[in-house]
Amino acid sequence: MIVGIGIDIVYIPRILNLWKKFGNKFLKKVFSQEEIKDSNKYTSCEGKARHFAKRFAAKEAYVKALGTGFGKSIKMSDITTYNTLYGKPQITVKKSNIDYKAELSLSDDTDYAIAFIILHKES
């Protein structure tokens, strides 16, 4: 049973500008340690910015699907987006008792990154 659908689009240069302006403080506030570490596979700032923009969009899409937004119960850095060995994007949430499965799709082109997520309960 589907319990929520979320979508978000991010302007990649915005993420790059925030990163340049606030540095690691921005990264640590928004992204998990795993996401920051995973960005090291990219050698260019632009590649890293695409990586972070897709994960930013995934976090926003996730809380939209939940219908809660960010707040006391969930912070951006509590959410981790990663890829399986086969490249499929996955999402996990620390300190959460939410028991939904997530189907996540990420994409980027030119200056934009997008995330689409479906949350569902297993029958």
UniProtKB/Swiss-Prot annotation:
It comes from the Bacteria. The keyword Transferase applies. It is found in: Cytoplasm. Transmembrane segments: none annotated. Mg(2+) binds at residues 8, 60. The keyword Lipid metabolism applies. InterPro entries: 4-PPantetheinyl_Trfase_dom, 4-PPantetheinyl_Trfase_dom_sf, ACPS, P-Pant_transferase_sf, Ppantetheine-prot_Trfase_dom. SUPFAM superfamilies: 4'-phosphopantetheinyl transferase. One of its GO terms (biological process) is lysine biosynthetic process via aminoadipic acid. Its EC number is 2.7.8.7. One of its GO terms (cellular component) is cytosol. Coiled coil: none annotated. GO terms for molecular function: holo-[acyl-carrier-protein] synthase activity; magnesium ion binding. Its cofactor is Mg(2+). Keywords: Cytoplasm, Fatty acid biosynthesis, Fatty acid metabolism, Lipid biosynthesis, Lipid metabolism, Magnesium, Metal-binding, Transferase. It catalyses: apo-[ACP] + CoA = holo-[ACP] + adenosine 3',5'-bisphosphate + H(+). Pfam families: ACPS. Transfers the 4'-phosphopantetheine moiety from coenzyme A to a Ser of acyl-carrier-protein. NCBIfam families: acpS (TIGR00516), pantethn_trn (TIGR00556), PRK14659.1 (NF011253). Belongs to the P-Pant transferase superfamily. AcpS family. This is Holo-[acyl-carrier-protein] synthase. The gene is acpS.
